Design a protein with these regions (language model features):
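Low-complexity, Gly/Ser/Thr/Pro-rich intrinsically disordered linker/tail segments
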Residues: 121-138
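...with weaker cross-activation on analogous glycine-rich loops/strands in unrelated enzymes
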Residues: 58-116
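Terminal peptide-recognition signature
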Residues: 24, 47, 81
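Intrinsically disordered, low-complexity proline/serine/threonine-rich regions
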Residues: 16-22, 26, 35-37, 54-55, ...
C-alpha cells in the first residue's frame, strides 16, 4: 500500500519549534514508558526535555536535575507555560486551567485540569509541589 507524506509535514533539519503547546500535544496519548523519550513511549521528564531539545537548548533529562536547573517562579498562581515539579514528577500548564504530563497511573500522556491534578498527586502519591518555574525563564 502506498503511503504519502504531506509536503507541509516536512521540516528543514534546522527547523525550531517555538510553540511548546504544539510540541507537547504531538505526544498526547503516547504510552507512558519510564526512561522513554520517543513517540513510542515517554516519561514525564523527557516530555518536558524534548521541547528544549527541539529548540537546541540544553535542559536536564531527570526531574531532580530539572528542579535544580530551573529558577523558581515568584507568583503562586499557575499560568500558561508554568512547569510544575514534584519529587520524581513534572508537567506543564498549557494555560491556567489545563495541564499536560506523562502520567504513570494512567499509562499515557494526557491533559488534565491543573488544580485537580495538583490535588490528585498530593492525595494519591502524598507529594507536594516542590517548585514552579516558567518555560520562558529557561
Amino acid at each position: 500500500e502506498n503511503k504519502w507524506i504531506k509536503k507541509s509535514d516536512i521540516k528543514n533539519i534546522h527547523h525550531y519549534e517555538k510553540n511548546y503547546i504544539k510540541v507537547f500535544k504531538f505526544f498526547l496519548n503516547t504510552k507512558y514508558l519510564w526512561g522513554g523519550k520517543t513517540c513510542v513511549g515517554i516519561d514525564c521528564s523527557a516530555l518536558i526535555q524534548i521541547y528544549f531539545y527541539y529548540n537546541r537548548i540544553f535542559f536536564p533529562r531527570d526531574t531532580k536535575d530539572q528542579i535544580r536547573f530551573c529558577k523558581r517562579k515568584r507568583s503562586k498562581n499557575q499560568l500558561k507555560g508554568d512547569i510544575v515539579f514534584w519529587k520524581g514528577h513534572v508537567g506543564i500548564c498549557l494555560n491556567k486551567s489545563r495541564f499536560i504530563h506523562a502520567y504513570g497511573p494512567k499509562k499515557k500522556v494526557l491533559i488534565m485540569p491543573t488544580v485537580q491534578t495538583i490535588k490528585l498527586i498530593d492525595k494519591t502519591a502524598n507529594l507536594k509541589v516542590k517548585k514552579v518555574s516558567n518555560i520562558s525563564n529557561i
